[in-house]
Amino acid sequence: MDLSEEVLAQVRAELAPTGVLRAGINLSNFLLVTGKTDEGNPEGVSPSMAAEVARRLSVDIQYVTFKTPGELADAATDDVWDIGLIGAEPERARHITFTKAYSEIEATYLVPAGSPLNSIEDVDQPGVRISVPARAAFELWLTDNIQHAELHRAVGRQAYVDFVEQGFDALAGLRAGLINDVDNLPGSRILDGKFTSVQQAIGTPKGRDVAANFLSDFVEEAKRSGFVGELIEHFGVSGRLTPAP
């Protein structure tokens, strides 16, 4: 990105008027946040993407962490973050301007031992009960697209607990997370395919048009140059997290 100092000054004025870029980070996505630094800051693909934005702008970075993506999205109008790294979804886009995705994560279902459900299409049937983490990007997709099955929403890992304890027919989740769950549930299976891919993007609150254009250009260059792929490899999430096209 070869920007004039005038344009960079406009971007800084919208994204970091105090000289600090406040980056909203969703801690619940273990593929994108894989640990903590010695200073206690989040570490992983998403924090590194945010840090690179700050470096390009020659400003300091401050990580603003959230337990769930829904909480991060809800804070878009509270002036607590300047960029937010979460899944881009239409509901969230009412208050957030998103870039195109920089990475994708498949979402699918886990079914218990003995389940008659064998495909993604089998799940959306009358009488089928799906446990899903509330406010996750894929939960928003299911809310918009499931026509016959019943959705049971719970906060975070409680969706898994309810799936096991209440005997639901399917657990919706990111494939990489379900791979860990299936090992703890003898006979359970992860269905082939996906019902959606979560599009991980960078967003900024509505009304920051110059900043939004800068972020869009940054993401496209980060993908094209191989920077996103390098981060994915560096943090050991290759094969579970993929660069978006």
Predicted regions and their residues:
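Ligand-binding cleft/hinge of the Venus flytrap
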Residues: V33-E39, A50-D60, T99, R135-G156, ...
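Extracytoplasmic small-molecule ligand-binding "clamshell" domains
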Residues: D2-G87, R92-R94, S225, H234
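Periplasmic-binding protein-like
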Residues: L27, S103-G114, R175-E220, S238-P245
